[in-house]
Amino acid sequence: MNQFKVISKFNPTGDQPKAIKSIAKGIEKGEKFQTLIGVTGSGKTFTMANIIEKVQKPTLVLAHNKTLAAQLCSEFREFFPNNAVEYFVSYYDYYQPEAYVAQSDTYIEKDASINDEIDKLRHSATSALFERKDVIIVASVSCIYGLGNPEEYKKLTISLREGMEKDRDEIIKKLVEIQYERNDIDFSRGTFRVKGDVLDIFPASSSSKAVRIEFFGDEIDRIKEFDVLTGETITKLKHISIFPASHFATSKDRLEIAIKNIEEELEERVKELVSQDKILEAQRLKQRTNFDIEMMREVGYCTGIENYSRVLDGRAKGTPPQTLLDYFPQDFLLFIDESHVTLPQVKAMQAGDKSRKDSLVEYGFRLPCAYDNRPLTFKEFENKLNQVVFVSATPAKYELEYSANTAEQVIRPTGLLDPEIIVKPVKGQIDDLYTSIQETIKRGFRILVTTLTKKMAEDLTDYLKEMGVKTRYLHSDIDTIERMKIIHDLRKGEFHVLVGINLLREGLDIPEVALVTILDADKEGFLRSETSLIQTVGRAARNSESKVIMYGDVITKSMEKTIRETNRRRKIQMEHNEKHGIVPKTIIKDIREVIQISDIAEERKEYDNLNEALKSYNNDIDKLIEKYEEEMKEAAQNLQFEKAAHLRDVIYKLKRDKETEL
């Protein structure tokens, strides 16, 4: 077995050795929950890599979005070039979930565009877990969605060895059963082709290499791996495992049992609908389900087969789905990166899925078994965990309460100090801001400005542009690729000031930023909480000349705690620098061109069409306000501050409209 081995020109320094030793010791002692508190720029990923090397456990690293997962995966691949580092995120470029809107009698069919490259990477991740122990998978929270039964996946794997007696047609039959398609013309991922005694298979986990099986009678004579483009042999193999082309592949025997159970559930549900005088719904359900059954009998699967996953797995009603977590061996290790954001996401997922399924089941579009094709509930997620390390600069109450051990990583190897925080009065804040911006630009650096409202951000951007300052506004409507391009342009100096509400997302640790300003810092609330203030201050922690200006007439508790914590960290770093003769240096980071990655289509709710929203709530303005307040709190908890601020503005408008009516 390959051992995890970190390859790096750097050795752990500062707080890293202590944190690595402390967390690794906790894992070896069998502690279930631990927390690594690491400030921005302290090398948390390097610490994680060294912990993995020390404990030698297959590892899952959970990130709160696809882009951050890609960044982490890239870093881990640099640290572990000789081990399997895989990437597992949602494979949808675009995803419109199946839904039914009863008010308008509108059925919205599931519509999705699958990214073939990401699907390949998902197959590569699951197959790696069955082939070796030295595996790190970096995943987004989509890994808590149902994935198909790992036991069935393993059982359906075709194992071929040189010299094995095996009938060619029998292998072809098995390939079809695990959802490979024969295609002698367009040879692509998940297909096979046959020419005489030669069988070529293009594995689902590969994009450029395929396998050639050469027969001599009923015996496998040779197995080769070859380049699909050139046809050249890469290597000769003694053994090859061909994993299913779909995670939902099912054996014929199990499929027959599942179909019988689906038919029984259909009969029962149709009777129930008829007894409620829902004749149309009963007829619709019968027609749709029978069509799916016919497809399963003919080709082994159907569109939306995941809705029958509970029946296909043979699971009891209400039991948790099988997910990526079930593909890992029992002794796996989980790192939850940016846990203060990732955990609330995990908690929220199942509730949203259920509300969408309610109308599909009620109106005869799906059988009740569709409820069990869902993400894990938070309790189920907890039950599947073995050992967990929460990683965050600002861990939440949950992480700190559950952790038996907490390691702190305050010292940065670069010697960089947390920025100095200056508090200035609100009166004249815009004029003072303009002066500070001009001084920073003269020194060749960039500026981040955070505001409380969307309108203020827009007005400030317009004002600064009028004053001749090259400024851009980063708002929630900008997709991931455009966001990355804006950050790239800021670093290159195409513009100097970036204004926004939520500057806490990935990709904003920019070394060129030497000034972060927080307008209306004394307005206590979700946008100016201790967590968000500490995170915002951290945006300036990559530059040796950086500072933070908070504009506020009073010092709130959140401001006080942030200033106290920042000063504590500065003192620790200064003492370390003095002791070791370290001179703080700004991080040197290459400005890479924007990588064209396809991003998951995030469902966005439109909150601006209030008339339509009120209609759907029978013009009950109080109920709509209550709903939006819940969504605002949830968005704030997830650090989605632009969304929360927009919802807050919508709530104000609704309340004003209500007062006007009275």
Curated annotation (Swiss-Prot):
A GO cellular-component term linked to this record: cytoplasm
Compartments in which it is found: Cytoplasm
Family matches, as Pfam families: Helicase_C, ResIII, UVR, UvrB, UvrB_inter
Domain of life from the UniProt record: Bacteria
Chief localization: cytoplasm
Sorted UniProt keywords: ATP-binding, Cytoplasm, DNA damage, DNA excision, DNA repair, Excision nuclease, Helicase, Hydrolase, Nucleotide-binding, SOS response
Gene Ontology MF: a single term: ATP hydrolysis activity
Annotated Helicase ATP-binding domain residues: 25-182
Limits of the UVR domain: 622-657
InterPro entries assigned to the protein according to its UniProt record, in alphabetical order: Helicase/UvrB_N, Helicase_ATP-bd, Helicase_C-like, P-loop_NTPase, UVR_dom, UVR_dom_sf, UvrB, UvrB_inter
Motif (Beta-hairpin) on chain: 91-114
Statement: the UniProt record of this protein carries the keyword Protein transport: no
GO BP terms, alphabetized: nucleotide-excision repair; SOS response
CDD domains the record matches: DEXHc_UvrB, SF2_C_UvrB
Positions of the Helicase C-terminal domain: 429-595
Record note on domains: The beta-hairpin motif is involved in DNA binding.
Family: Belongs to the UvrB family.
Quaternary organization: Forms a heterotetramer with UvrA during the search for lesions. Interacts with UvrC in an incision complex.
Protein name, entry field: UvrABC system protein B
Protein's organism: Clostridium botulinum (strain Loch Maree / Type A3)
